[in-house]
C-alpha cells in the first residue's frame, strides 16, 4: 500500500513540476526551513553528495526557481527561493496533500485515529534507528532528512510537537 501511495504522490508531484526526484525535496526544504541556507546544508538535508547538490542547485537556478546570494565577505553563498520557486514549492505541497487526502478519504474517524497512532510508533522507531545508524557510522554516509518534504505547519513543529524531533529528544533522554 505504501508503494501505491508513494507512486501516486510522485506522479502528482511530477505533473506539477517535472524536475526529477530531488528537486521537490530541495524546494520544500528551502520553503519550509532552509531558505538562505548553504549548499552544504541542503546537501545534508537531501542526502546528496556536495557535487550532486551543486548540480541540482545549478539546474534549479537555470529554471529560475532559486538563486545564489553571496555574503558581504564574498566567502559564503546562500541558496534562496525566487518568487517563482516559492509558488512551485506551494503547488508541490498542495499536490502531495491532495494525493494523501484522497488516499485517506475512505477511512472512518476511528480508522484514521488508529492509523495515526500506528504511524507515530513507526516514525519513532525509524527515527531512533536513523539516529543510531548515524552514531555508529564513522563515515557518516549522507542520508536524507526524514523531514525533507515536511509541511511544518501540519506537523506542529512551531508548537514543539514535531514527531521526529520528539522521537530524537526522547531517544537522547533514555
What does each model-identified segment do?
Residues 113, 117-174:
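C-terminal regulatory/oligomerization modules of transcriptional regulators
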Residues 2-13, 89-107, 115-126, 154:
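Hydrophobic alpha-helical core bundles mediating ligand binding, dimerization, or RNAP-core interactions
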Residues 10-51, 63, 162:
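N-terminal helix-turn-helix DNA-binding core of bacterial DNA-binding proteins
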Residues 19, 92, 139:
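Residue-level marker of regulatory loop/turn positions in helix-turn-helix DNA-binding domains and
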Residues 33, 37, 95, 107-110, ...:
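Residue-level signal for short amphipathic helical patches enriched in basic/charged
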Residues 58-113:
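Charged, amphipathic alpha-helical coiled-coil/dimerization segments
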Residues 2, 27, 31, 82, ...:
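Generic structural concept
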